[in-house]
């Protein structure tokens, strides 16, 4: 009798457990079904061409935006370390490596979606010489400019107390207490405009050479590490000639943060100092990018996919 009772109890427990598992499974499937039904219903409302258009436009726009936010936030952050007199990190070497690493992280984040241009000079050069669709140029450049502005704004939120501690709440563009250089690029006082223009043109030309060579199909060992090679190239260019211009090589990297400083308290004189130097990092890198790709033409490297 005891054995029979035990067997009945075991069978009943097994049946209850099976029933509970079945109920939990049904509940889970019901929840998943409702979620996926909503998702699929929304997805079905877009036909294939619409989804493709959305992915081709908005995903690339967001990738360029986020990548440029990261690039500018980190690059200007390294500049802040130099400006705010954090002595253990105060050197051009630190700033140069910071620029390279910032670009590398931006490439890692957005490269698989948009190609990680992160730079209007790159986008324009690719459009003219390497078959990048002209219809995408406005979207890319807009994303880059907005991303640069947003990156500067985010950095300001983070380091604003340190800036106040350094300048006493007075926003200086020039002088020992200048903090505008955290965001925009400004050459040393002893450097002429001509030298700064030459530095930006040559630096951007070399940057485009590095991008095109490392991305060429015949350079397989380099293509797999293209982001790292570009970052190393930027670091090297900065160490060699970057100090003469403040080192921009990127119109978005300078214009976005400079515009932010104009709004955030430094005033629109940030566009006028050094005889309207703001025009140099705005246009010289674009010319430099074109020069860089023109130098590649004799070597038939223009088959690189932008």
Swiss-Prot record:
Residues on Cytoplasmic side: 1-59, 114-145, 214-226, 300-306
Question: What cellular-component terms does GO give this entry?
Answer: plasma membrane
Cell compartment(s), UniProt: Cell membrane
Molecular function GO labels: glycerol channel activity; water channel activity
Its placement in the membrane is given as:
Multi-pass membrane protein
Looking up InterPro entries in the UniProt record yields:
Aquaporin-like, MIP, MIP/Aquaporin, MIP_CS
> Motif (NPA 2) spans which residues?
250-252
Where are the annotated segments for Disordered?
1-24
Record's catalysed reaction(s): H2O(in) = H2O(out)
Compositional bias of kind Polar residues: 1-23
Per the record's keyword annotation, is Transmembrane helix included, yes or no?
yes
Q: Does the keyword Hydrolase apply?
A: no
Query: Which parts of the sequence form the motif NPA 1?
Result: 119-121
Q: Which residues lie on this side of the membrane: Extracellular?
A: 81-92, 167-192, 248-278
Q: Report TM segments.
A: 60-80, 93-113, 146-166, 193-213, 227-247, 279-299
What does the record note about the induction of this protein?
Expression is high at the spore resting stage and further increases about 1.5-fold during spore swelling, up to 90 minutes after induction of germination, followed by a 6.5-fold decrease before and during polar growth.
Listed A to Z, the keywords are:
Cell membrane, Membrane, Repeat, Transmembrane, Transmembrane helix, Transport
Q: What is its main location?
A: membrane
**What is said about the domains?**
Aquaporins contain two tandem repeats each containing three membrane-spanning domains and a pore-forming loop with the signature motif Asn-Pro-Ala (NPA). The His-85 and His-275 residues facing the outside of the cell are involved in pH sensing.
- This chain's protein is named Aquaporin-1
Q: Which organism is it from?
A: Rhizopus delemar (strain RA 99-880 / ATCC MYA-4621 / FGSC 9543 / NRRL 43880)
């Amino acid at each position: 009798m005891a054995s029979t009772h035990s067997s009945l109890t075991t069978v009943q427990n097994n049946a209850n457990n099976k029933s509970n598992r079945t109920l939990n499974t049904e509940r889970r499937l019901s929840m998943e079904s409702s979620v996926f039904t909503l998702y699929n219903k929304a997805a079905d409302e877009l036909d294939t061409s619409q989804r493709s258009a959305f992915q081709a436009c908005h995903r690339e726009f967001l990738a360029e935006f986020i990548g440029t936010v990261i690039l500018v936030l980190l690059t200007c952050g390294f500049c802040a370390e130099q400006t705010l007199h954090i002595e253990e990190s105060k050197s051009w070497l630190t700033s140069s490596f910071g620029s390279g690493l910032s670009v590398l992280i931006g490439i890692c984040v957005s490269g698989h979606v948009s190609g990680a241009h992160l730079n209007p000079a790159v986008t324009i050069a690719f459009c003219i010489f390497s078959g990048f669709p002209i219809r995408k140029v406005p979207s890319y450049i807009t994303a880059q400019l907005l991303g640069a502005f947003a990156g500067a704004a985010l950095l300001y939120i983070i380091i604003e107390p340190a800036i106040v501690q350094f300048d006493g709440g007075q926003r200086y563009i020039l002088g020992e207490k200048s903090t505008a250089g955290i965001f925009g690029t400004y050459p040393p006082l002893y450097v002429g405009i001509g030298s700064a223009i030459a530095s930006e043109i040559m630096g951007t030309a070399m940057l485009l050479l590095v991008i095109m060579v490392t991305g060429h199909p015949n350079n397989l060992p380099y293509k797999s590490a293209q982001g790292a090679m570009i970052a190393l190239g930027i670091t090297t260019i900065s160490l060699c000639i970057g100090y003469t211009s403040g080192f921009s090589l990127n119109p978005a990297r300078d214009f976005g943060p400079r515009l932010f400083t104009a709004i955030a308290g430094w005033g629109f004189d940030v566009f006028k100092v050094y005889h309207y130097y703001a025009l140099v990092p705005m246009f010289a890198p674009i010319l430099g990018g074109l020069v860089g790709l023109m130098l590649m033409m004799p070597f038939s490297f223009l088959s690189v996919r932008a």
